[in-house]
């Protein structure tokens, strides 16, 4: 997995406005979760290269946006999206245990920062 290019394609939303008017700073929360995860796993940066942090933030931003849209509007099937992401990352050799840890970290950050998360 060395030599990852920076994330391309459709960018995840930076923020979301929920039905009740609450704005969720998706990018900020994903960045916090990514930083925590990679601080605990610096070997990921060594293994995957200089764009590891960008990809981690990108993927966690998507996951948080899917979770918020699923919970708020039922507009996205979070479990289907997570299944897809896990299959993509697994096919690229990314350890699913590390994905699970990153998702737990994202959940912790969301619980700390969002009301009624």
Regions found by a protein language model. Name each.
Residues 1-117:
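Core of compact, soluble alpha-helical bundle domains
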């Amino acid at each position: 997995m060395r030599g990852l290019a920076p994330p391309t394609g459709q960018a995840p939303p930076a923020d979301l406005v929920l039905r009740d008017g609450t704005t969720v700073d998706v990018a900020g929360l994903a960045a916090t979760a990514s930083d925590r995860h990679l601080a605990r796993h610096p070997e990921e940066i060594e293994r995957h290269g200089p764009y590891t942090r960008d990809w981690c933030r990108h993927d966690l931003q998507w996951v948080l946006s899917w979770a918020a849209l699923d919970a708020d509007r039922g507009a996205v099937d979070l479990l289907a999206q997570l299944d897809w992401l896990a299959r993509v990352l697994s096919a690229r050799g990314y350890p699913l245990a590390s994905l699970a840890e990153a998702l737990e970290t994202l959940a912790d950050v969301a619980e700390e920062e969002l009301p009624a998360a």
